[in-house]
Each structure stands twice: as C-alpha cells, then as structure tokens.
Amino acid sequence: MKFLVLWRMELSLLSSEMAAAVARMPRYAGPLERAGKVIARYHLVGQHGGAWIYEVSSNEELERTLAMSPVYNFARYEIHPLAEMPDPVNP
C-alpha cells in the first residue's frame, strides 16, 4: 500500500525541542528508505514541512511508522492513499 503523507510544522509550537526534532529527520528517514518503506521524500517549497511517499503493508504499519517520526508531536499530517493509474488505452 502506498500513501502520500503531507506534513507541515505547527509554527505555534516553535521551540528548541522542535528544531532538534527537525534535525533528527534524516536519521529517521535513512533506515526507512533503505528498507523500502519511504520511496520518495520532498520538501514543500515555501512551507515548513514535507511530502513523503510511504510503501507499507497496512494502515497500522503506516500509523506506527509515522508515530516514530521525530516531528510527530509538532506537525499536522494529511494522508492520501495512492493507487496505480493504469493506461486506459493499453491495459
């Protein structure tokens, strides 16, 4: 199952703890990328957050994975399930 996860930092919670959490994001992402759980990640230009594509086996695995994120308590999440888009001309 693939999910597009958009996360945006809650700037009203800005603190040194939040800054430290953001700095830990690459260490969080690395093992997930190597395991194939995060297949793409992008910065949202002009915003404080990111767009990540996760590939996991279940909704529960996605929830557990997001809960391990260093910014989990500082961000708002939008989660969009993704589906393959077959070519209607050449199915």
Predicted regions and their residues:
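Conserved, structured core segments of small domains
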Residues: 1-91
